[in-house]
C-alpha cells in the first residue's frame, strides 16, 4: 500500500531519499524546501534548492515558505491530508501544529548516531572530533532538537581519509534504504520506537566562518581532520607565500606526514609538507583563488611556495 506523503528537504543530501520514496511507489503529494537563494556575482539570480529542482523534474507541487509558524502555512499543510511527513535536512523548525498534523507523524533522517551530534552539522562535527564511526538514524520527530524516538539506525566507520563529501553521499543512500524500511513497518503496523539515551548527548553547531581558516599552530592530526570535515565546501583555507606574493588558497585534501615539526608554517623544499604545532601534514589537493582544483604535483610545477600562514 502506498502512503500519502509530504517531503521536506533542501540540499543534495536529501535528494536520494526523495527519489527512493517515489521509486518505491509512495504518493509524494507535496515537497517543501528552503526558498531560492541569490547567487552570482551581483547576487541577482535566485537559485532553487537541489530538492526543489528534483521535485519539479517529477512534477510535484513545491512550497518554499520562509516559516511554518503562520496559521496560513499550517492550514495549507493540513489540507494535504498526508499519512506522514518525511524530513531530511530541511532547515526550518517544525512547530507543534505541523508535527501533529500527519496521521502517523513526521519522520526525520539524521546523519549521526543520536544522541551524539544533534543539530545542524553532524557529519562535519563527527569528523572534526575524530570519531571512529557515525551513522544514519530515522526518528519520529517531537518538538525538541533531534530528540525524537529512534526507529532504525545503521553505523559506518570514519577513516583517516573520510571527507564530508564522501560521507554525506554514503549516508544519504543509507538513509534512503532506512526510510523505505521505516515506511514498510509503518504500513504493517509494526513500528517500534526506542527513546534516545539521556547520556552521551552532544550538539553539532553550524560551521562558523572563522573555523575555515587553518591554524598551523594546531597539531597535524587536528588540522587533517579539519580539512576533511570541511571538504569540499566551505573548504579550509590558508595564506601562502607564492613567488613572493601572499595568496589565499583553499586546501581540499591532505594526509599526515612523518617527521618532526620544526618551524611552524615552514614548507619542505619541492613539496607541500607543512610543519605544524605538532607533527607535519602534506597537502595533496588545493585550489588557488579563482583557479582550478589541482593535485600537489601539478600545483608545484607552476608555483614556488616558501611558507604558509
Curated annotation (Swiss-Prot):
Gene3D superfamilies: 3.40.50.12230
Binding site for (6S)-5,6,7,8-tetrahydrofolate: 112-115
Key words of the record: Protein biosynthesis, Transferase
GO terms under cellular component: cytosol
EC code: 2.1.2.9
Family from the record: Belongs to the Fmt family.
Protein name per the record: Methionyl-tRNA formyltransferase
Organism per entry: Bartonella tribocorum (strain CIP 105476 / IBS 506)
Organism taxonomic ancestry: Bacteria, Pseudomonadati, Pseudomonadota, Alphaproteobacteria, Hyphomicrobiales
